[in-house]
């Protein structure tokens, strides 16, 4: 087995990988109802660090050091939060009637109306497009998705050490 080498990454080398991983994670986290599977945020961070490793590892025996993996995975999560928020607002505008019907279906299936309302707000956003709610959700998503992306980045780094 070849010895593994810790790779150092310059921020300028990580921009495209971080943005691409964030776009993939944000797209998947922006799909209503599928976004409740938060694993997509981990996948975005994992993809970011994997692409970064492919870019800077000239000899195929390196791994991204943990601090860089956490940083760039987390940054991809921040990008994901903005993209997912954009998708949520677009879906709320274009598919409002469908989401109202989905909420009514949940209530008719026996779900409490307050819980159905929260479910729709988590899956998309407040259908009345309340700016304070959208901003609060964006802040929460930035924090959550940054953590998920950092976890994905750390996992990618650990897998590449093997």
Q: What does each model-identified segment do?
A:
Residues 1-162:
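Juxtamembrane/disordered regions of integral membrane proteins
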